[in-house]
Amino acid sequence: MNDSRRQGENAIGRRQLLKGVAGAALVAVGLGGRRAAAEEKAAEAKPALKGRIKQAACGGVFPKGLSFEEKCKLMKELGLHGHDLLGPTEFETLKKYGLICTMVRGSAGIAKGFNRKENHEECVDKAKVAIEAAAAAGFPNVIVMSGNREGMADDVGLANCVEGLKKFAAFAEEKKVTVCMELLNSKRNHKDYMCDRTAWGAEMCKKVGSPRIKLLYDIYHMQVQEGDILATITEFIPYIGHFHTAGVPGRNEIDDSQELYYPAIMRAIADLKYDGYVAHEYGPKKDALESLKKAIAICDV
């Protein structure tokens, strides 16, 4: 075979190869384009939340075995705003996914709280550290507790809580962080806890006199303790800075397996122009992911 013929055949081979590569590239681009279009269509098809209720989650509602990063991915996918009851070690991962810590840990524990003066130094220090961390991260809330009665009269405990909270109320105002004392039932789950009635907590907030001192209204706990949920929320909404959900009885799913009708509760909260967060804090008995999706749908009014 002479050199000119060989060169001609090589040229033809190169042209065929280039055509094949170009064709494959076009196919790949086409497939990639179709895949991107399909993903975009799927994203568009996914129903957006109405947004009247800004929802978040606590750790116990997720499927077991998920890493914190996997939980963040899931929260983002489901349209949640963030996660309750975390500290600074989790903040970076939350921010990576465009999420927030909707309630930063700031208490010395449930039993040890502001109702005893001897606890004030520790409780104030912990609260101020949490407020500083929340402010630096741009997060809205910090949780505190009243503490247990241990024989103390409620009016004495209320006065002590007011005194303790006033020690950092101005600091919270300066940092634009709201400190929420949680309402818990003492009837069943937290025997002897002092901040167990909404009226008591609201009176405490009134006496502190700061827009940055409010209540964390746990719907489960207050149904167990005092009932009358809709009327109570309506009366005391100016003093409520955060909500928790769970079913009654059992503290499980908020679906129709329990006694509270959450759609009506959420509509009432939304109609009151509440602009804070509602965090799910139940313990799932059923499939955790499906229960979480359902809880979000129930509260999306």
Question: Where are the predicted features?
Answer:
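Histidine-acidic metal/acid-base catalytic patches
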Residues: N2-A56, V61, G65-K76, G138-P140, ...
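Short acidic, glycine/proline-enriched helix-loop-strand junctions
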Residues: E92-V104, V177
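Active-site-proximal loop/turn and secondary-structure-junction residues that shape catalytic pockets
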Residues: V61-P63, G87-T89, S107-G109, N148-E150, ...
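Active-site acidic/histidine proton-transfer and metal-coordination neighborhood
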Residues: G20-L31, E44-L49, G113-K214, V224
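Catalytic domains of carbohydrate-active enzymes, especially glycoside hydrolases
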Residues: K71-E90
